[in-house]
């Protein structure tokens, strides 16, 4: 059993955090909320998605697993106005999801969860540096780097966080000191990452006033932030590109 009502734009923003990496996902639903763990097809990035019942106006659920085509959900949410609510109900007999939004009534077929890639095991990593900053600051650096290169170096020197991109002829670097950051736990680290992935991840992350980056040396980066007015959390894990000598 699953029946819920939620703000349309809140749901749209939440789905975006997943759809930047995957086209379909298994949604584990329980009385404790909604959980998704997914990895992109190239095994480069993972996403952890948790939404509590408090993110919803109404939420009733037993343990169940739904397979959803995210592009289909995004298409449906595209008709929503800012103040619309989305009502969802699982028809257990037909195995379809009924959605009501802005006067529209949809009935969509669910994907068989067994045909969707299994949840990844999220590795436990010891990453010594932590940087907390506004999502807009990371977005600015990514946009500047995209004009120069297809990868970006992130690191910490002393008590400053830097983001750097270098192409064949040009180079750009943004340095943020402790007083320009929300917080920093410094450690001498640096890792290189694909801008294709960072650009996708920053789309939802840039909407957050506070994102947390965890870095090591040539290690994956963890990018964490809250969604749904603090009633949900997102965590990305992005593998590094190893620098050649």
Curated annotation (Swiss-Prot):
Please provide the record's keywords in A-Z order: DNA replication, DNA-binding
What molecular function does GO assign, one term? DNA binding
User: Which SUPFAM superfamilies does the annotation name?
Assistant: DNA clamp (SSF55979)
One matching Pfam family = PCNA_N
Q: Which BP terms from GO are recorded?
A: leading strand elongation; regulation of DNA replication
Which HAMAP family does this UniProt record tie to the protein?
A: DNApol_clamp_arch (MF_00317)
Q: What does the similarity note say?
A: Belongs to the PCNA family.
What interactions and quaternary structure are annotated?
Homotrimer. The subunits circularize to form a toroid; DNA passes through its center. Replication factor C (RFC) is required to load the toroid on the DNA.
Function as written in the Swiss-Prot or TrEMBL entry: Sliding clamp subunit that acts as a moving platform for DNA processing. Responsible for tethering the catalytic subunit of DNA polymerase and other proteins to DNA during high-speed replication.
Give the protein name, as stated in the record. Answer: DNA polymerase sliding clamp
> Which species is this UniProt entry from?
Methanococcoides burtonii (strain DSM 6242 / NBRC 107633 / OCM 468 / ACE-M)
The taxonomy runs: Archaea, Methanobacteriati, Methanobacteriota, Stenosarchaea group, Methanomicrobia
Name of the encoding gene: pcn
């Amino acid at each position: 059993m699953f029946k819920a009502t939620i703000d349309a734009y809140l749901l749209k923003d939440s789905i975006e955090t997943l759809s930047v990496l995957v086209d379909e996902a298994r949604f584990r639903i329980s009385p404790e909320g909604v959980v998704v763990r997914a990895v992109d097809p190239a095994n480069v990035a993972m996403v952890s998605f948790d939404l509590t019942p408090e993110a919803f106006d109404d939420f009733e659920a037993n343990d169940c697993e739904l397979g959803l085509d995210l592009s289909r959900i995004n298409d449906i949410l595209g008709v929503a106005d800012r103040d619309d609510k989305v009502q969802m109900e699982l028809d257990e007999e037909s195995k379809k999801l009924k959605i009501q939004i802005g006067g529209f009534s949809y009935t969509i077929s669910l994907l068989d969860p067994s045909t969707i890639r299994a949840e990844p095991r999220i590795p436990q990593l010891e990453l010594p540096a932590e940087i907390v900053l506004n999502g807009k600051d990371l977005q600015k650096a990514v946009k500047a780097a995209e004009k120069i290169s297809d990868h970006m170096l992130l690191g910490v020197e002393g008590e400053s966080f830097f983001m750097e991109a270098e192409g064949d002829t040009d180079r750009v670097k943004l340095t943020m000191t402790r007083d320009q950051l929300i917080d920093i736990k410094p450690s001498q680290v640096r890792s290189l990452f694909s801008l294709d992935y960072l650009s996708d991840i920053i789309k939802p992350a840039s909407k957050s006033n506070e994102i947390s980056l965890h870095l090591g040396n040539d290690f994956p980066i963890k990018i964490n932030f809250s969604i749904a007015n603090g009633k949900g959390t997102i965590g990305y894990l992005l593998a590094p590109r190893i620098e050649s000598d």
